[in-house]
Curated annotation (Swiss-Prot):
Light-harvesting photosynthetic bile pigment-protein from the phycobiliprotein complex (phycobilisome, PBS). Phycocyanin is the major phycobiliprotein in the PBS rod. The gene is cpcB2. It is a peripheral membrane protein. CDD domains: PC_PEC_beta. It comes from the Bacteria. It is found in: Cellular thylakoid membrane. (2R,3E)-phycocyanobilin 2 binds at C153. Keywords: Antenna complex, Bile pigment, Chromophore, Electron transport, Membrane, Methylation, Photosynthesis, Phycobilisome, Thylakoid, Transport. Contains two covalently linked bilin chromophores. One of its GO terms (cellular component) is plasma membrane-derived thylakoid membrane. This is C-phycocyanin-2 beta subunit.
Length: 172
């Protein structure tokens, strides 16, 4: 896992060069957006249970075969495992937002997930739909302007969306 600062230094060191002006500008923007970043992480964290529960509920309403007898999420134990996995993915998305870098999400959560799900017979497409539902809820929550730092958050929302997209692509 690398935060944005460590990653920039590692890249410059690998090339045997100083950190470039464009990299410094990008890091300045990351610092300038730090409070917004913390607001997003705090909002998602505070609402994580409802984000996961609502996304799972919507997924099972859209795909009732998953919870029907013989379905992949049939039985409370399997539903709980599905929701646990969704919660883990959401947690790692918040880590990525906090650090400004996707490597923690990719390295510690997504690598090998598709293969694991395939081996267990978990329908990756359904998991991807659940992730998309969490994405919609998290972005709506993060975009609410009440009680957060004012300013343009479009780049941060795009970044947040990209982490969910990476997760959905990794399982789908």
């Amino acid at each position: 896992m690398l935060d944005a600062f460590t990653k920039v230094v590692a890249q410059a060191d690998t090339r045997g060069r100083f950190v470039s002006d464009s990299q410094i500008d990008a890091l300045k923007q990351l610092v300038a957006d730090g409070t917004k970043r913390l607001d997003v992480v705090n909002r998602i964290t505070a609402s994580s249970s409802s984000i996961v529960t609502d996304a799972a509920r919507a997924l099972f309403e859209d795909q009732p075969q998953l919870i029907a007898p013989g379905g992949n999420a049939y039985t409370n134990r399997r539903i709980a495992a599905c929701m646990r996995d969704m919660d883990i993915i959401l947690r790692y998305v918040t880590y990525a937002v906090f650090s400004g870098d996707a490597s923690v999400l990719e390295d510690r959560c997504l690598n090998g997930l598709r293969e694991t799900y395939s081996a267990l017979g978990v329908p990756g497409g359904s998991v991807a739909v659940g992730i998309d539902k969490m994405k919609a809820a998290a972005i709506a929550l993060a975009n609410d302007p009440n009680g957060v730092t004012r300013g343009d958050c479009s780049a941060l929302m795009s970044e947040l969306a990209s982490y969910f997209d990476k997760a959905a692509a990794a399982v789908g």
